Design a protein with these regions (language model features):
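N-terminal beta-strand-loop-alpha-helix module at the start
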Residues: 1-73
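An acidic- and aromatic-residue-enriched active-site/binding cleft used to recognize and process polar
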Residues: 10, 33, 73-76, 103-105, ...
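Glycine/tryptophan-enriched, flexible segments
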Residues: 161-305
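Active-site-proximal binding-pocket segments
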Residues: 267, 272, 277-349
C-alpha cells in the first residue's frame, strides 16, 4: 500500500522502531512550511536549528534506505501550508494511506485529526516513542484530580523506572527530593567550565528564512551557529555535561550570573525537544557518571538533574494535555498589559 508518512520538525527520533524497517512503499515527508514556522514569532536561532536538524534527519533516513521527500521553505513545489502540501502530495503520488506521529501541540494535534477525517484513505497515527509517560498514562494519573502535584508524579516515575531507588521501593538515601540543597547563590569568584559549542555556517538557511519573509525575534550569528543539530552532536553534548558539568549542576541549578550565560546547565533542551536524544538515555548517562564518580557527583546533584528530566519535563506535558485547550487561555494573575518591546528585542538602554 503506497504510504505517505509525515514527520514534524520536533519528531526527529533517530531510534524510533520504524527507522529500522525500510519499506519501498512508504515515503517519509519532512516539510518546512510558512504556516507552521510563522504562526507565532519564533526565535531566529530556533528556526535555523529546526531547519538544519530536519535536513540532517532527512539524510539519516535516506542512508537507512528510506524514501524521503524533504520540501524546503522556498522550494518551487512547496504549496505554502502543511495541509496544502499534504493534499497535493497525496493526489500527485496517488497515496493509498496517510501516516503521522502524535503531535506534542494541541493545535496541531487537532488540525491533523480534522484533516485526516476529510481523507478517503486509511490513516494511521504512531507514537513518537520519546516520552516516558504515554498519553494514556498521563490521562490515568491526572484524571479526576483537583490538584496535580508534581512531587506525586515524580515519585511515580522514579518507581516506574527504578531510578535512584534502593531496591526495596524506597528512594536512594532515604529522601525523594534534595531541592533544599540545590539552591545556592552563585559565587562570582568560583571557576566555571566553558560550554561545549559547535560551529556551523548556516548563513544559507538564514537567508532562506529572510527570503520567505518569516518574522522572527532575537538575533543570531548564522556563520557560527553553536547548537547541536544532529544525534551525534546531541550525544557529544550529553557526554560533555555528565563528565564535566553535572558535578555542580544541582547546587547551582537555580543560580544566575551576569557574566556566565550557561553555568553548569546541560543545554540539552533543543536535542530533547526535537527528539534527537531520548530522556531515558540522558538519565542513564547521568546515573552512570554518578555511579562511576560518587566522590565527584553527590546524590543531591544527580537527583536535581533527574527531577528536571523525568519530573518537571514529563509532568508539565501531563498538565498541558490534561487542561488543554483551556490551559492556553489561563491568566491566573489577571495581567492585562502587553509585554514591552524590549522583552522581544532585548534593547533595554
Amino acid at each position: 500500500m503506497k504510504t505517505l508518512r509525515l514527520v514534524l520538525g520536533d519528531q526527529l527520533n533517530y531510534t524510533h522502531s520504524l527507522v529500522y524497517t525500510p519499506d519501498a512503499d512508504t515515503t517519509w515527508l519532512i516539510l518546512e512550511t510558512k504556516d507552521e514556522t510563522g504562526y507565532v514569532d519564533h526565535h531566529i536561532q530556533k528556526v535555523i536549528g529546526f531547519f538544519a536538524a530536519m535536513y540532517n534527519y532527512a539524510r539519516f533516513l535516506e542512508k537507512k534506505g528510506h524514501q524521503v521527500i524533504h520540501i524546503k521553505i522556498n522550494d518551487s513545489q512547496n504549496k505554502g501550508s502543511l495541509i496544502n502540501n499534504l493534499s497535493n502530495l497525496i493526489q500527485e503520488l496517488k497515496i493509498e494511506k496517510f501516516e503521522y506521529f502524535l503531535p506534542d501541540e494541541f493545535r496541531l494535534d487537532e488540525r491533523l485529526k480534522q484533516y485526516s477525517n476529510t481523507l478517503s484513505i486509511p490513516v494511521q497515527v504512531w507514537d513518537t516513542e520519546h516520552f516516558l509517560a504515554e498519553r494514556a498514562t498521563l490521562g490515568q494519573f491526572f484524571e479526576g484530580k483537583k490538584e496535580y502535584l508534581m512531587e506525586s508524579f515524580y515519585r511515580m516515575m522514579r518507581k516506574r523506572y527504578g531510578i535512584l531507588m534502593d531496591g526495596n521501593g524506597k528512594p536512594l538515601g532515604g529522601k525523594w527530593n534534595y531541592d533544599a540543597e540545590n539552591r545556592k547563590k552563585w559565587d562570582a569568584k568560583k571557576k566555571t567550565i566553558p560550554p561545549l559549542l559547535f560551529t556551523h555556517n548556516f548563513t544559507d538557511i538564514a537567508l532562506e528564512i529572510e527570503k520567505a519573509q518569516i518574522k522572527t525575534i532575537g538575533s543570531v550569528n548564522a556563520a557560527a551557529f553553536n547548537w547541536p543539530v544532529s544525534r551525534k552532536e546531541s550525544l557529544e553534548l550529553l557526554h560533555y555535561f555528565v563528565n564535566y558539568l553535572l558535578p555542580q549542576f544541582g547546587t547551582y541549578q537555580d543560580a544566575m550570573s551576569i557574566n556566565e550565560w550557561s553555568l553548569f546547565h546541560s543545554r540539552l533542551s533543543f536535542s530533547l525537544n526535537t527528539k534527537m536524544i531520548h530522556p531515558l538515555e540522558v538519565v542513564r548517562a547521568a546515573l552512570a557518571a554518578f555511579e562511576k564518580w560518587p566522590e565527584k557527583i553527590s546524590l543531591s546533584q544527580i537527583e536535581g538533574f533527574v527531577r528536571q528530566i523525568i519530573g518537571w519535563r514529563e509532568y508539565m506535558r501531563g498538565v498541558y494535555w490534561a487542561w488543554m485547550p483551556e490551559f492556553a487561555g489561563l491568566n491566573y494573575f489577571n495581567h492585562q498589559r502587553k509585554l514591552p518591546v524590549w522583552f522581544w528585542n532585548a534593547d533595554t538602554q
